[in-house]
Amino acid sequence: MFLKSSLFSALRRPALLAAAALGLVACDPVSFTAPTAAVNPNQPVVVALMVPMASGNSDTEQLAQNMINAANMAVSDLNNSAIDLRIYETGGNAEMAAAAATRAVADGAQIIVGPLYSTSTAAVAPIAAKAGINVLSFSNTTSVAGGNVYIMGTTFDTIADRLVRQAVNDGKTNMAIVYQEGVSGESGKGSIERAITRNGASLATAVSYPLNITDMGAAASGIADTLRASNANAVFFTDSPLRGLGFITASLASNRFRTKRDAQFMGLSRWDSSNEVLVTPSLQGGWFAVPDPDLTLEFNTRYQLANGIEAHKLSGLAYDGIAAVGAMINAARASGDRNAFSKARLTDPAGFAGVTGIFRFKADGTNERGLAIMQVDNGVATMISPAPRSFGGAGS
């Protein structure tokens, strides 16, 4: 089912965010040869928003409602871009997402914003492609990008690139990678290796550990010895604070290898996920990357005033997706171009200014984002390098 938004208004500020979406799927990008849906300048543009409503999970339902709220905020903020926003429930699964895509096509959707999960995105993509419709997925899984799919979530590649550049600027060019066994760890390792190569740094060593406490603790001594022997002055961790990050860094500290003293620790995940993480002794002085903190705070404040609840960390993706659509419609109408969502317009190198920072889509369907660097400092996250406000700056 879908809900038709009664809001048709306009952009008092450009909008688009960063965040991360969930799930991994391995698939080839869908071939996209059909022309993109044309926009009638005299009619509202039908935009399909796909959210994981009807999942049966209370947390997911809350996230879905947050995304709907944020999307309606974006429509309300739009100026001279009539959007007919329709909301489709995906249930957070591929089967419902495919059915939602079929309904969206039948309803005349000219672009799809969402869905959240990579498996749902993979199910939606071929249905949308057949109708000549582009998909702005909330996922950060690069394997689903390409063809008619553009992902909005912050990717490992973007995070790794930002952190490597910061380390290189600080003279730390000999880098090690400590990663957990499994798909997620291997994916993060690959992103870091590519960032090291792109930025002229050196890979000192890469070492993995098993995802169970007993074996992780036993492996820590050997990992510490390997790091010391490599002479690495920066160490990347791919793991999350919700999994093994705290334990592996504490185990390294017990084996006399510590951040700042022996090397600069850096992480692909958000180390500000809780106050407990920020006071973890083994993470003090460590770096991680986040969307623009000042813009994020501004959006969160606006969201709470408008909706009476705190914004979910991923809700800005929905705002930014709808606002990007509005910006492209405005630009197309100003130039008399009926092809508002062409690849050339989507991949404009100037990108979009989002509610949590700048981002732009790449030709392969992935994205780049402007991120800030934060340092763990006795229970707080301190910004040591701001996010850029346009592409081409040092922090982009």
Indicate where each model-derived feature is located.
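Extracytosolic ligand-binding ectodomains
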Residues: 2-396
